[in-house]
Amino acid sequence: MGSIYSQLFVKLSLPDSSTIKNKTILVTGSNTGLGLEAARHALNLGAGIVILAVRSVLKSEEAKTDITRADPDLMERVLVWPLDLESFASVRAFISRAREYVSNGGRLDGVILNAGIASLAWRVTEDGWERSLQVNVLSTALLALGLLPLLLQASSKDPDSNLSKPHLTILASDIHKTAMFNERHAENILSVLNDKDQWGKSQQAGGATERYAVTKLLDIYITQEIAKLVPLSEDGEPRVVVNCVAPGFCKSNLLSREEGVPVVVKMLQWAVGRSVVEGSKTLIYAVGMGSESHGCWVEDQVVRE
């Protein structure tokens, strides 16, 4: 959620346009909030194609109109693809669509996996998983693994340019530092995380944001493990940069969608939260970072670990 100091005084910047210009950038959860503004930044920085991956195609068409209002000619550079992270079938269909897009002459240069939820109530998806566990972790990992080969294909077209390296950026959060994650001692961690009784115990012990914090911690682990799968080029550098980024505590609708959010959290959000325009700079900046960020956690646009 960011320290009070960084929330108020750290000045965020956009990446050099050369890291985005003419590239194809895909952003999940991009019909509103951080995702929408990250897509807008990409378009303004000269991205050749921006793909809005969204649950509601209708709302995303509205988002498409929004980010191209200043220049309607940009409409043809924005694509809208349906994606529901609460459904593994939807994720697989999305990956298939991306493969078809690339096989037909398209390319994928940057992926920002921004979509996520902060569920404060026990809910199960159609696939039988606790909702935030599936959306923030399982589907995010599945999507990342499915899109990585397509990013590698783009890498093979520009093998010598560090600035042209494809990127896979996962949205994390520094709230992971608060996670108690007592389930880490279990023999089958995912099974325990998917147990309703254990979920209740964890929420009672760690507070209302415990599950969200755990999922964001797991996103960092996902980043580290996927980074290990990336082959190296002849100079020893990764062919695709995989990183995760914290946008800080932002005035997005992540919390407003849920009931039971502690009043103190809402007050902090109002008092020190970054605007989504500002916070989204961290996402698009991460897509322009070099190999030093590979497998790492990025906070306030600085590699932390």
Feature-to-residue mapping (PLM):
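Alpha-helical membrane-targeting segments
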Residues: 1-12, 205, 249-278
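Short, contiguous pre-domain boundary segments
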Residues: 8, 304-305
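Rossmann-fold NAD(P)H-dependent dehydrogenase/reductase core
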Residues: 3-5, 9-249
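Feature representing long, continuous alpha-helical segments
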Residues: 220-224, 252, 277, 281
